[in-house]
């Protein structure tokens, strides 16, 4: 009996020593009784399946005994090849039992993540497209290569997308709804706006890329971390089965308190070949305090204003990789038409769209894309913030062989905002709010400017009508009877043209 007691005590001591850490999130808004569990990297499929079977039995026993939590159990299961895990609603005793499994790396409370920008301002210019293709601010044309992101798929991990908006030309599809609200639409407008910047025919950078809507935030602009991790997992698997992760871009214009689970999920997506653009956040603070912006392997984006200064609301610090236009950006709105928003949420899709553009043009992918964006960008941003290692504003590098296209401008009657073709979906509460009646930390109420930004006018300008399609370099005999064949051949098929078009490969 004494020997048996000694062995029992020894096993208990070993179990306690190997117990996984249950992380605390004292400054975050948590989801009651909801947790994310991450397994150790060497966990096999068999071990994971065995753990789930054990969990079901243990959880059922604990709930039956106490019956204190409604709708408890596993909600999401994650499998990123090298990283496995799950989330769900569990009582305290079950969480303690889970942490004792030596295959568990850590347990993390599920926290609320929100969009990183939702402000409507009136009578402002649309300048972001023109800025990324011109060396100086104030230009009014967007110059781009006619490849325009063709063959690349962009995943909008956001509030959903109005996939029927005319700006997407049928290139947008609905992918997944991790909110599980039965509402496959963008009831906020945030996801449609960011998607328009990425791939829209009028507002977008990669005008020929495909778009997949992945809803991870509700119509109020917020959602649990567990659902966002599930959304990332879905994107990785969908891309792998549909063209490859090296042909995929993910945009996450969202953020919240630092989360090991969310950062690890984002890192797994990058490791498997995807490019991730992430908003730095709008609190005018060090971006290392939030996720997924603090994950080193993603491309973390700060916001710039029209005068090439850091937007007053933009986060800063060592986590930042790049800056992109984010103040007063006009893009698509649900139901048709356009609206203006500000935030690092608007900056990140500029980077995602340009990433898709460069991936199609140069054949690069994954982590190499962020490095290429740094090479092509200009050292233009002023007042970058404490500890920020970069002042680089993104640029498409003069759009090798590109064609000019005017950026969206004011409508003939600038006092009238661009209206949707049909009524926008009803919105429960003010979209983009963390709590009813309150704006996100560091953001103004809708209709008010950020501190230090220009005051709003009376209405937002509508985009200008689409100009005639720019002439493709291979369009035969432009100019009709006056066509200069020798000059045309020299311009488009001479060595200088091809050196410019493919210099990145040859030099």
From Swiss-Prot:
Segments of skewed composition (Pro residues): 405-428, 438-449, 462-476
E.C. code: 3.4.21.-
Glycan attachment residues as annotated in the record: 251
Region Disordered, annotated ranges: 175-198, 282-312, 378-486
Primary location group: secreted
Molecular function via GO: serine-type endopeptidase activity
Keyword DNA damage in record: no
A biological process from GO: proteolysis
Residue intervals of the Inhibitor I9 domain: 34-113
Propeptide residue range(s): 20-116
Domain Peptidase S8: 126-400
Biased composition, class Low complexity, residue ranges: 450-461
Enzyme active site: 158 (charge relay system), 190 (charge relay system), 345 (charge relay system)
Classification via InterPro entries: PCSK9_ProteinaseK-like, Peptidase_S8/S53_dom, Peptidase_S8/S53_dom_sf, Peptidase_S8_Ser-AS, Peptidase_S8_subtilisin-like, Peptidase_S8_subtilisin-rel, S8pro/Inhibitor_I9, S8pro/Inhibitor_I9_sf
Keyword terms of this UniProt record: Glycoprotein, Hydrolase, Protease, Secreted, Serine protease, Signal, Virulence, Zymogen
Keyword Repeat set for record: no
Function according to Swiss-Prot or TrEMBL: Secreted subtilisin-like serine protease with keratinolytic activity that contributes to pathogenicity.
PANTHER family (alphabetical): ALKALINE PROTEASE 1-RELATED, PEPTIDASE S8
Family the UniProt entry places it in: Belongs to the peptidase S8 family.
Name this protein carries in UniProt: Subtilisin-like protease 1
């Amino acid at each position: 009996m004494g020997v048996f007691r000694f062995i029992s005590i020894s096993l208990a001591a070993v179990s306690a020593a190997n117990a996984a850490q249950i992380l605390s999130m004292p400054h975050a808004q948590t989801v009651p009784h909801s947790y994310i569990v991450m397994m150790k990297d060497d966990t096999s499929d068999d071990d994971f399946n065995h753990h789930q079977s054990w969990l079901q039995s243990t959880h059922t026993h604990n709930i039956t005994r106490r019956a204190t939590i409604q709708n408890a159990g596993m909600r999401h299961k994650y499998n990123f090849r090298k990283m496995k895990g799950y989330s769900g609603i569990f009582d305290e005793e079950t969480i303690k039992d889970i942490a004792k499994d030596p295959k568990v790396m850590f347990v993390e409370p599920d926290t609320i993540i929100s969009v990183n920008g939702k402000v409507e301002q009136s009578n402002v210019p649309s300048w972001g497209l023109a800025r990324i293709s011109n060396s100086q601010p104030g230009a009014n044309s967007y110059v781009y290569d006619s490849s325009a992101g063709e063959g690349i798929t962009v995943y909008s991990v956001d509030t959903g997308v109005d996939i029927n908006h005319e700006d997407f030309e049928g290139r947008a599809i609905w992918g997944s709804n991790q909110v599980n609200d039965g509402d496959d639409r963008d009831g906020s407008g945030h996801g449609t706006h960011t998607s328009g910047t990425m791939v829209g025919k009028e507002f977008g950078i990669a005008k020929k890329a495909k778009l997949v809507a992945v809803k991870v935030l509700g119509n109020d602009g917020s959602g649990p971390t567990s659902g966002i991790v599930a959304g990332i997992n879905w994107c990785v698997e969908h891309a792998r089965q549909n063209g490859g992760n090296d042909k995929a871009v993910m945009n996450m214009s969202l953020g919240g308190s630092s989360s090991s689970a969310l950062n690890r999920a984002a890192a797994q997506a990058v490791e498997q070949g995807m490019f991730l653009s992430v908003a730095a956040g709008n609190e005018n603070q060090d971006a290392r305090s939030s996720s997924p912006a603090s994950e080193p392997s993603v491309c973390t984006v700060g916001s710039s204003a029209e005068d090439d200064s850091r937007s007053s609301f933009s986060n800063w610090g060592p986590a930042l990789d790049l800056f992109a236009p984010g103040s007063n950006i006009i893009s698509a709105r649900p139901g048709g038409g356009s609206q203006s928003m500000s935030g690092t949420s608007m900056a990140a899709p500029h980077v995602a769209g340009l990433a898709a553009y460069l991936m199609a043009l140069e054949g690069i992918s994954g982590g190499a894309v962020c490095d290429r964006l740094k090479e092509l960008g200009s050292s233009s941003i002023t007042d970058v913030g404490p500890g920020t290692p970069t002042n680089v504003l993104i640029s498409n590098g003069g759009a090798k062989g590109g064609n000019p296209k005017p950026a969206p401008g004011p409508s003939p009657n600038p006092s009238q905002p661009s209206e949707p073709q049909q009524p926008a979906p009803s919105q429960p509460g003010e979209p983009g709010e963390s709590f009813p009646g309150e704006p996100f930390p560091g953001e103004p109420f809708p209709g008010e400017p950020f501190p230090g930004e220009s005051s709003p006018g009376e209405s937002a300008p509508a985009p200008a009508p689409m100009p005639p399609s720019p002439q493709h370099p291979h369009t035969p005999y432009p100019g009709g009877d006056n066509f200069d064949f020798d000059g045309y051949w020299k311009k488009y098929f001479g060595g200088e043209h091809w050196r410019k078009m493919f210099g990145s490969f040859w030099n």
